């Protein structure tokens, strides 16, 4: 800390002069009012700057997230890293296989990659899905699977957001009726899906032309390997016939395929005995698959004769922990047809954050692998953020952002505020001024400027760590003014209040994220109102903090002035008499200029003939006059005598 003092001298008798500490403030200073004390400062700055979110994905904790991907996150791909949209570090966090997707592993169409997706993490990032798209041309009793994919991805994101672990269960225990055998279909490239499996029944047209009703059973486990299963995602598949005649060419009954739970309750399927046919004119059935969320247990499947579609796989979730879900848009480059099922599924799932490109996919390794824009959007996965949201991620500590961050959002997210509404605090050169504080009745040292200020402003200081250092609890040990400890004690409660405020804000927003309502806009409007109220409350608290901060530093600096005045009085001994706070009378005949330099300029090299017992060089480190308040002048190795400067001396003699 540096000091700049202006000493003003006035003559009281022919041989005596009066020296006082004098204010040194001009129009370049601004006044800052505080609780218990005010400050003049040469500079000011906002307590916090507005932060801008970075577009793309990030995570709150590197140790608690997991990714599920394909070739664009597959480190084992022969073209890695040119084929990847993530760094090698991030690729290690993904469960990936080139050519794979969650839906391919669920249904297992012939000739496609079948990968066992499983893993645990509070935050799950999904960058997959493109391998089951129109370009894949999967044709098995339907050509367009986009609506099924949309429903599948939506259920995956929903269950993943409520679970710590998830796993594909690729082999369910089952019991198949004796008359049914595993079959293939011409409409499925003379093969069939692994899930559901197709079982057919040979029928003797002359004796039993309609066949027997199929009754089968499957069991959803409570555990698959090391993975606990509290809920399963099951595909309930069945055929849709346009008319009874299309199905019943032999004059038999209506088509049905129904799943029952252990109590006999229908949980999925289609029953044309009670539901009408489509009425269309097609002569080939279409396969439909609904997504069911089922608890572990034994389920039965009943179907009309000849065909049985049997669930063989599921995705299992432990439902132990809620957490963020990030879905990354998964599309092809030029020349390949994509769908937008991932985008639509995420946007319709509470708690899911969607990462979307603004430009077409342009790969580096080939047209479909290694897009620079996607690499930038996913580069945040290498870091930890304080806040993740649909608007992007933030790792700065400021509690405010210019624009409202769109939900869902997680972590310590900044609130929207206008720049001009953020309180300003003093910075640069600081000078305490007078103030009254009835709560300070017995300060541990006499404080100039509280009720008995001398001639006005006394003291100029440069806060080494910047004034923000006091608020954030970080400053150097050296320097004057308030200490880190006193600032922390003074603001501890308010600091805790702010954290509680932030936490309660995030909890409220996360609860709203979890709500499902037919009026989504009403929920968003309510969320915005809550955040605006929180922002105003936080700005109000910061105003209080600013006033306390100014007062705290002002008082601390004034205590430092008392230390300075005490040192001057002690150095002067009987040569100077303190006639009022900050003013001394000296006999000019007894204490000459070198003597005055020693007393008031702290001149360590000047001879002091009038005080022979003292050394001519002073080491303030060992000077007993500086033993005292830790809030006083912190004279340390970093602050030497050379840092003390008398900026001006005026001597006036009176008759």
UniProtKB/Swiss-Prot annotation:
SUPFAM superfamilies per UniProt: Influenza hemagglutinin (stalk), SGNH hydrolase, Viral protein domain
Catalytic function, reaction form: N-acetyl-9-O-acetylneuraminate + H2O = N-acetylneuraminate + acetate + H(+); N-acetyl-4-O-acetylneuraminate + H2O = N-acetylneuraminate + acetate + H(+)
GO CC, alphabetical: host cell plasma membrane; membrane; viral envelope; virion membrane
Chain intervals for the UniProt region annotation (Esterase domain-1): 41-158
Topology in membrane: Single-pass type I membrane protein
GO MF annotations, alphabetized: host cell surface receptor binding; sialate 4-O-acetylesterase activity; sialate 9-O-acetylesterase activity
Cytoplasmic compartment residues: 652-655
Region (Fusion domain-1): 15-40
Signal sequence annotation: 1-14
Function according to Swiss-Prot or TrEMBL: Binds to the N-acetyl-9-O-acetylneuraminic acid residues on the cell surface, bringing about the attachment of the virus particle to the cell. Plays a major role in the determination of host range restriction and virulence. Class I viral fusion protein. Responsible for penetration of the virus into the cell cytoplasm by mediating the fusion of the membrane of the endocytosed virus particle with the endosomal membrane. Low pH in endosomes induce an irreversible conformational change in HEF2, releasing the fusion hydrophobic peptide. Several trimers are required to form a competent fusion pore.
Family: Belongs to the influenza viruses hemagglutinin family.
Protein name according to UniProt: Hemagglutinin-esterase-fusion glycoprotein
Species annotation: Influenza C virus (strain C/Ann Arbor/1/1950)
Lineage: Viruses, Riboviria, Orthornavirae, Negarnaviricota, Polyploviricotina
């Amino acid at each position: 800390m540096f000091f700049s003092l202006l000493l003003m001298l006035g003559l009281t008798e022919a041989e005596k002069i009066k020296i006082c500490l004098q204010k040194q403030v001009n129009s370049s200073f601004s006044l800052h009012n505080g609780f218990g004390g005010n400050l003049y400062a040469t500079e000011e700055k906002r307590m916090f700057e507005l932060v801008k979110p970075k577009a793309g994905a990030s995570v709150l904790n590197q140790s608690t997230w997991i990714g599920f991907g394909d070739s664009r996150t597959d480190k084992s791909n022969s073209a890695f890293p040119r084929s990847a949209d993530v760094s090698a570090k991030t690729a290690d966090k993904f469960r990936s296989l080139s050519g794979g997707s969650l839906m391919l592993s669920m249904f297992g169409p012939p000739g496609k990659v079948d990968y066992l997706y499983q893993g645990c993490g509070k935050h799950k990032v999904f960058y997959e899905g493109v391998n089951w798209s129109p370009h894949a041309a999967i044709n098995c009793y339907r050509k367009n699977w986009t609506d099924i994919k949309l429903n599948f991805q939506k259920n995956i994101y929903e269950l993943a957001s409520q679970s710590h672990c998830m796993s594909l269960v690729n082999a369910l225990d089952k019991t198949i009726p004796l008359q049914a055998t595993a079959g293939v279909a011409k409409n499925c490239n003379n093969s069939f899906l692994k899930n559901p499996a197709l079982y057919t029944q040979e029928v003797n047209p002359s004796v039993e032309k309609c066949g027997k009703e199929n009754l089968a059973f499957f069991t959803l486990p409570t555990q698959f390997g090391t993975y606990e299963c509290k809920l399963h995602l099951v595909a309930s598949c069945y055929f849709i016939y346009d008319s009874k005649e299309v199905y019943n060419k032999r004059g038999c009954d209506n088509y049905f395929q129904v799943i029952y739970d252990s109590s006999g309750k229908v949980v999925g399927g289609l029953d044309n005995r009670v539901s009408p046919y489509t009425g269309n004119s097609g002569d080939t059935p279409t396969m439909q698959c609904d997504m069911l969320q089922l608890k572990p247990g034994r389920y039965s499947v009943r179907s009309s004769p000849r065909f049985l579609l049997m669930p063989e796989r599921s995705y299992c979730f432990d439902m132990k922990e809620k957490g963020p879900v990030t879905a990354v848009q998964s599309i092809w480059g030029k020349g390949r047809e994509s769908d937008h099922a991932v985008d639509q599924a995420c946007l319709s799932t509470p708690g899911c954050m969607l990462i979307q490109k603004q430009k077409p996919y342009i790969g580096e390794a080939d047209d479909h692998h290694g897009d620079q824009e996607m690499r930038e959007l996913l580069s945040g996965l290498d870091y930890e953020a304080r806040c993740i949201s649909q608007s992007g991620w933030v790792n700065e500590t400021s509690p405010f952002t210019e624009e409202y961050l769109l939900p869902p959002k997680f972590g310590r997210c900044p609130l929207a505020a206008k720049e001009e509404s953020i309180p300003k605090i003093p910075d640069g050169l600081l000078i305490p001024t007078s103030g009254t504080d009835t709560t300070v009745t017995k300060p541990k040292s006499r404080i100039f400027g509280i009720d008995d200020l001398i001639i006005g402003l006394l003291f100029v200081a440069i806060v080494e760590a910047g004034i923000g250092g006091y608020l954030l609890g970080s400053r150097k040990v050296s320097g004057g003014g308030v200490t880190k400890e006193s600032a922390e004690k003074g603001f501890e409660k308010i600091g805790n209040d702010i954290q509680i405020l932030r936490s309660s804000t995030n909890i409220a927003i996360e609860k709203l994220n979890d709500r499902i309502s037919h009026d989504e806009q009403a929920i968003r409007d309510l969320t915005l109102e809550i955040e605006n109220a929180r922002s105003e409350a936080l700005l109000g608290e910061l105003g209080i903090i600013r006033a306390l901060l100014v007062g705290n530093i002002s008082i601390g600096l004034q205590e430092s002035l008392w230390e300075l005045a005490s040192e001057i009085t002690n150095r002067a001994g009987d040569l100077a008499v303190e006639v009022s706070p900050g003013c001394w009378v000296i006999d000019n005949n007894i204490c000459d200029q070198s003597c005055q330099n020693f007393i008031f300029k702290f001149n360590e090299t000047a001879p002091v003939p009038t005080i022979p017992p003292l050394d001519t060089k002073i080491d303030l480190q060992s000077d007993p006059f500086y033993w005292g308040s830790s809030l006083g002048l912190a004279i340390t190795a970093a602050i030497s005598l050379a840092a003390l400067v008398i900026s001006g001396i005026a001597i006036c003699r009176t008759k």
